[in-house]
C-alpha cells in the first residue's frame, strides 16, 4: 500500500507542471495562489492485471490566496508498465471563499501521461456552485515549483 501511495503521488507530481494575484480578463477573473495537498490510499474495488497498477486515494487540500478554501475528494489512477504512461481522474468539492464570495463548487480532474508527456484538464463541474458561487464556471491549472503546489484559476460567475 505504501508503494501505491508513492506511485500515485509521483503521478500527481508529474501531471502538475507565482505569486498570488488577481486580474480581470473580460468577464473572467484570473487568480493564483498556493495550496497544500494530502493523499491517503483507500481500499480499491478493482485490482490491476497484466502489468496495470490501479489505485484509489483520498484527496484533501487547503488553498490560500484569493481562493481561501479546503477541499475533499477521491482520485482513481492507473499506471502502465511503460515508463511515464499513466492516467488519473478525480472529483473534489471545494468549500470556502473565492475572491470574498462564500460557497462551494466541484472540480473534476482528467489527466493522462503518454511516455512522460502530460495533459491535465481541471474544470468546475457545471451547476455545482453554491451560495455566492452559484453560476461559477472555470478552469484551473496546477504547477509544482520547488516542491510547492500552486494554482492558477480562471473563472467566471454568471448571474443567469
Regions found by a protein language model. Name each.
Residues 4-6, 14-160:
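Targeting-peptide/extracellular-domain and disordered-appendage signature
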Amino acid at each position: 500500500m505504501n508503494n501505491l501511495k508513492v506511485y500515485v503521488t509521483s503521478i500527481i507530481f508529474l501531471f502538475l507542471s507565482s505569486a498570488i494575484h488577481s486580474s480581470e480578463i473580460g468577464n473572467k477573473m484570473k487568480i493564483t495562489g498556493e495550496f497544500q495537498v494530502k493523499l491517503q490510499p483507500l481500499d480499491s474495488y478493482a485490482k490491476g492485471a497484466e502489468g496495470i497498477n490501479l489505485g484509489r486515494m483520498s484527496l484533501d487540500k487547503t488553498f490560500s490566496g484569493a481562493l481561501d478554501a479546503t477541499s475533499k475528494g477521491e482520485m482513481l489512477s492507473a499506471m502502465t508498465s511503460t515508463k511515464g504512461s499513466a492516467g488519473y481522474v478525480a472529483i473534489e468539492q471545494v468549500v470556502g471563499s473565492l475572491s470574498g464570495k462564500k460557497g462551494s463548487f466541484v472540480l473534476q480532474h482528467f489527466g493522462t501521461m503518454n511516455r512522460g508527456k502530460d495533459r491535465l484538464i481541471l474544470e468546475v463541474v457545471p451547476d455545482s456552485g453554491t451560495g455566492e458561487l452559484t453560476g461559477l464556471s472555470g478552469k484551473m491549472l496546477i504547477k509544482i515549483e520547488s516542491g510547492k503546489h500552486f494554482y492558477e484559476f480562471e473563472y467566471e460567475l454568471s448571474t443567469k
